Amino acid sequence: MSKISNLIDFYNGKSLNKDKVTSNSMKFTGNGILDYPKTRKKEVSQLTTLSNSDINIICNTLKIPLKGVFMKDEFKLPLQDGNYIMNLQDSHEGGSHWVAFIKNKSNIFYHDSYAVIMPQNQYDLFKSNQNNIYYNTLQKQSLETTSCGWWSIYFLYYMYYSKGTLQKRFINFNKMFEHKKTNEHVDIKMNKNEALLLKIFKEIYFS
């Protein structure tokens, strides 16, 4: 876990988002839960792209209190406490990659399954209230998958239902998954993570 506690020269005024575009219509139509008939949920073998509607349905089913699912240019100040899922493209675009964050008083807990620093406008939004920003620095998702929406949902699910301080929950969540070690091919670890995430959703959702 890393923390940005002050306006520092960390970001260099640039968006570091280099996420792979996984869909040109994520905002409206995904290949996720809406394509899964209820009678076949247990047969799901891969977590695919989710639209904003998919995400809302799943979060509602899992009883995750959600402030909303937004494109990155749709936020307004003041930012209220709560759970958010955000797409890293603007509202006039089709959508690229889902991330999640929690605002709790003066703290922001930001999770990107690719472990990429948030775009500049989100950094500015978070810091507008002099918030502390906690973010993950280790990649969990394979670049060959489109499961970012599922990663975002499970992050909020874990943070909401687990015990302990939010800082402790954030640390424990990141410890659950494999991370690339020196001289190790990243996809080996990431594929294990994808399999674990699918197993988790089969237990908490596809059952």
Regions found by a protein language model. Name each.
Residues 5-8, 12:
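Residue-level detector of alpha-helical secondary structure
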Residues 13, 22-99, 103-108:
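Cysteine protease catalytic domains with a Cys-His-Asp triad
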Residues 83-160, 164:
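Cysteine protease-like catalytic core of ubiquitin/ubiquitin-like
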Residues 54, 121-125, 172, 196:
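Exposed alpha-helical structural elements
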Residues 1, 28-30, 36, 40-43, ...:
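Terminal export signals
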Residues 133-206:
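C-terminal folded domains that constitute the principal catalytic or ligand-binding module
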Residues 54-63, 126-130, 156, 205:
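Hydrophobic, Leu/Ile/Phe/Ala-enriched alpha-helical segments that form helix-helix packing faces
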